[in-house]
């Protein structure tokens, strides 16, 4: 996985941080946070917090006391130890797109299927730059709703040997994911000692944690599995239009969820989540890759470090309907501040289209290229006698060229990043090769990767036990 040792880009002054601190404290004490779960309300009552109906009015010092119990950094194991990940510090881990109900393949936009889910999972396995296939890479609408989480989890566990994300639609789905993890890794003790999944728990912003998300949180936290407590903020819709107000709300929501996770299981690993963008004030549509979202992302990194927490943000986000120039520049507008801020867990790193409604096969490849280039750009320079190349100057002298110099010949294969997607051909050669644009080249690449895909090995007995579990649970769920 990638370690980003570049300096973090911090934009908030000490005075600004103090103002934000006052803001979130006032929100949790005067407005409060709704928890649509009696179990959660009872935990807060027992901890001495003021509860009125479903609203908890939190003591900020109590919140910080709970947050301090969460680890600053932690490990997550994959079934292939080479793909274990570290969350926190300089580490950055990247996962594929999450949640779209539709897919785009070429000119066709359609409902996602289980076959699409499997193919995206296979693509995620085939690129080393991705540390995880994610979770719901796309929503397989051709499978029964009550049991499709079983098929998705089985695919993630068998078609990749990387870290996977847990299903969070309900507590039942979470229990199934945990049970399958126990099969894959050898029991409850094994997954509690070193967690095996990461699960996304979204806040129903503004200031409400709903029952389904909380049911899943209770299951995963009790099992010691990391959860990403994520305020879902589109400024102008789920938060006020100003970035400072959105940041204050984000802190209040994230820390209140993290506090609950620590009440469920003290020391449970958590990630400070952030999904922060804005709407088009003329149409009301969500917009992505905006300057405001990038600035909010930079602020979020600084805020999370202030609280001693790893954080999730960023991704190759775009509002574009197709893998065009807009899709590329908006994705970069989000991914560049992701690196500048040093986000530790990055969802939606490959495949996001149309505001998250669509998983795009060609866009997946474009995003992988962007991600590979950024990792190369954020790798520190090695400056030593060899890299200063004084001998090359002695060899070439004045007015010559370095193409044939020994220093060049020793390094020409690896001295520069070699793009898999970009074209640097002259116009005539590009036309002779069909005049194919980036989307067309991306199509060839993903098709080739799928043809060359090799499924990672898995013990036959473990595979059989997983498959038997899926069959049994599907029958119990009535599907």
Positions of PLM-derived features:
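Glycine-rich anion/phosphate-binding loop at the beta-strand->alpha-helix junction
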Residues: 200-370
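Catalytic alpha/beta active-site cores
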Residues: 57-240, 244
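Short acidic (Asp/Glu) and glycine-rich catalytic loops that position anionic groups and cofactors
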Residues: 1-4, 45-50, 196, 234, ...
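Catalytic-core signal marking the mid-to-C-terminal active-site face
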Residues: 10-23, 31, 36-43, 57, ...
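Flexible, glycine/charged-enriched surface loops at secondary-structure junctions
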Residues: 34-41, 52-54, 131, 191-193, ...
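N-terminal leader/transition segments
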Residues: 1-104, 445
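Conserved active-site and cofactor/substrate-binding residues in soluble primary-metabolism enzymes
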Residues: 15, 19, 35, 39, ...
């Amino acid at each position: 996985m990638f370690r980003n040792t570049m300096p973090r880009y911090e934009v908030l002054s000490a005075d600004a941080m103090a103002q934000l601190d006052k803001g979130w404290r006032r929100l949790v004490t005067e407005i409060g946070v709704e928890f649509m779960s009696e179990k959660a309300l009872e935990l807060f009552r027992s901890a001495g917090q003021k509860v009125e109906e479903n609203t908890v009015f939190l003591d900020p010092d109590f919140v910080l006391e709970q947050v301090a119990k969460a680890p600053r950094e932690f490990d997550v194991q994959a079934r292939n130890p080479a793909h274990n990940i570290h969350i926190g510090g300089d580490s950055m881990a990247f996962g594929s797109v999450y949640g779209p109900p539709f897919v785009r393949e070429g000119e066709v936009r359609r409902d996602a299927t289980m076959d699409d889910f499997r193919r995206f999972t296979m693509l995620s396995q085939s690129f080393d730059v991705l540390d995880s296939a994610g979770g719901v890479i796309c929503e397989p609408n051709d499978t029964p709703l009550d049991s499709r989480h079983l098929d998705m989890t089985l695919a993630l566990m068998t078609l990749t040997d990387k870290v996977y994300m847990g299903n969070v639609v309900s507590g039942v789905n979470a229990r199934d994911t945990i049970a399958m993890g126990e099969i894959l890794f050898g029991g409850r003790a094994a997954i509690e000692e070193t967690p095996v999944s990461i699960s996304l728990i979204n806040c129903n912003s503004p200031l409400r944690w709903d029952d389904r998300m909380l049911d899943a949180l209770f299951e995963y936290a009790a099992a010691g599995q990391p959860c990403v407590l994520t305020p879902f903020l589109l400024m102008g819709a789920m938060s006020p239009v100003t970035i400072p107000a959105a940041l204050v709300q984000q802190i209040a929501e994230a820390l209140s969820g993290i506090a609950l996770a620590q009440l469920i299981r003290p020391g449970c690993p958590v990630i400070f989540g952030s999904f922060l963008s804005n709407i088009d004030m003329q149409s009301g549509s969500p917009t992505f890759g905006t300057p405001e979202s990038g600035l909010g992302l930079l602020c979020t990194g600084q805020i999370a470090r202030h609280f001693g927490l790893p954080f999730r943000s960023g991704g190759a986000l775009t509002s574009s309907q197709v893998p065009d120039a807009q899709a590329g520049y908006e994705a970069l507008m989000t991914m560049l501040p992701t690196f500048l801020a040093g986000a530790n867990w990055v969802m939606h790193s490959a495949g996001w289209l149309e505001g998250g409604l669509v998983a795009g096969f060609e866009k997946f490849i474009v995003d992988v290229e962007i991600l590979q280039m950024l990792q190369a750009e954020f790798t520190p320079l090695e400056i030593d006698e060899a890299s200063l190349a004084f001998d090359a100057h002695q060899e070439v002298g004045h007015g010559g060229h370095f193409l044939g110099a020994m220093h060049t010949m020793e390094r020409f294969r690896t001295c520069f990043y070699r793009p898999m997607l970009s074209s640097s051909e002259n116009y005539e050669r590009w036309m002779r090769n069909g005049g194919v644009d980036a989307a067309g080249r991306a199509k060839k690449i993903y098709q080739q990767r799928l043809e060359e895909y090799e499924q990672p090995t898995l013990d036959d007995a473990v595979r059989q036990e997983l498959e038997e579990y899926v069959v049994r649970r599907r029958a119990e769920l009535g599907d």
